[in-house]
């Protein structure tokens, strides 16, 4: 009997093959897990960059720009997503469902949600005659990595990520909003992770655009942004209809408690999301909190919701954790006009669901 045909060596060959196959599989699974982990986040803080941007603003902080909204705030529970439900159904004929980022472009989703919610509220309150289109997140992402930082086309780099100050600068000072529609030679009707990656390198509009899409974006600026640094300011902003794009390193668990809150997690997140509603301990919500809308689709988190129509994919954050998130000083309230106090109709589209 030859050595190769000996049962002992046949078993060794089989075991070696099994081990090799297992190693290849584990390497593949690890690579996929790493890719998914990277694509879930994308906030890369640049404190110096944000400070430089804030120096460009006459009223950089919400305490200044939103003094009227803070002074007149009543501390009422406010649910801005209800305006979005109505506006989205009017524009698209279907319910609003939170999207899912495909690369580390969370900055564009956090600020995109903020701009969309603000526009829906303007429509609901009669400031706009037509229900708004959704912003194209790829444009915000590219603009935040290139034009928003004063860089030339093709200098964004291939790594993922951006920061709040760059997105705020792009939307309010050097660019603006491009909508989900065919525009400027691009069909932006649906989100494309590949387009986001390309535009993150080349800038808004991609390779060879040479500023054409920038000119279109400038027609629709998010006129006012202001730095928000604490719970009270954020709650006052939301009460007047101004969402807050929140950039932080605070992570969360993936199950909500009985009141719809998610507990702060052990592992940090470099992530941007959006605060879109508020509740107060002396109101029907019975706890101070802000509702945080994520960009991982509707099913990443489970557990009870409050109110019952709370958006899937969102969770409430308690006051202490909100303050920790905003302490990074890279989170911005957004508005298409100003930050004046608005006495919104809380008995209709902002009332508590039955």
What are these regions (language model features)?
Residues 6-17:
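N-terminal Sec-pathway targeting helices
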Residues 15-16, 27-132, 156-180, 329, ...:
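Structured alpha-helical subdomains that flank or immediately precede key functional sites
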Residues 20, 49, 77, 136, ...:
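Intrinsically disordered/low-complexity terminal segments and short unstructured peptides
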Residues 34-40, 108, 112-116, 146-293, ...:
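Predominantly the structural core of cysteine protease catalytic domains
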Residues 128-150:
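Acidic helix-start/capping segments at beta-turn-to-alpha-helix junctions
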